[in-house]
Amino acid sequence: MSGHSKWHNIQGRKNAQDSKRGKIFQKLSRELYMAAKQGGPDPSGNPSLRLVMDKAKAANMPKDNIKRALDKASDRDAANYDEVTYEGYGPGGVAILVEALTDNRNRTSSTVRVAITRHGGNMAAAGAVSYMFDRKGYLVISRDDLDVDEDQMLEDALEAGAEDMQTSDEAFEIYTDPKEFAQVRDALEEKGYKFVQNELTMVPQNLTPIPEDKVEQFQAMIDQLEDDDDVQEVYTAGDWPDD
């Protein structure tokens, strides 16, 4: 993981994602619904729900939208969703994982396959790609107006139980064992740190540079996947070239 900046790659795609706010709220509503359905509507006793609520707040999701999703979870007749992961390779042979919440596996499998193959990629069998990624807790602290140097930040992160930290001019990226994520987050919050992003994510063990002549095609593939209502997350091992 050392030397891999997830934040750099997120920022490389940020402008494209900013135009999808309505779609993001729709996906978050489904995540909130599922988390509340499985673990109850109280985030203090449901770590999964607290995590999704943090994501919703970071995305500036309206409180009414959050409330509607939680209220829906108490409806016994509301739809249920299956969690499904698809694996494949995008343009340039870059590994990708697609996580979905679906009420129709056949529909979602078909639309994911079309999005990947249409843009020069191919689907892969279960297990062909997932071993290249590790589940990690991921916390990002912006360096804007933060009077803490890298050494102090690293000391605080490790003391809280973090595994690793990456530093850029813009942010500190902190990685944790997924089981220790809540502990690390809470310990750093107690020290006054605020997060611009905090989530459980899939981190590639190694990055594959996206060829410059494939960047547009790769982005188009991700856009089509993320436009699918069933797709919740798209993870890639792609290293985006600097602008």
Swiss-Prot record:
Single GO term (MF): DNA binding
GO BP term, pick one: regulation of DNA-templated transcription
Region described as Disordered: 1-23
SUPFAM superfamilies in UniProt: YebC-like (SSF75625)
Primary localization class, coarse: cytoplasm
Matching Gene3D superfamilies: 1.10.10.200, 3.30.70.980
Locations listed in the record: Cytoplasm
Gene Ontology cellular component annotations, sorted alphabetically: cytosol
Keyword terms: Cytoplasm, DNA-binding, Transcription, Transcription regulation
Family the UniProt entry places it in: Belongs to the TACO1 family.
Record-given protein name: Probable transcriptional regulatory protein LCABL_11860
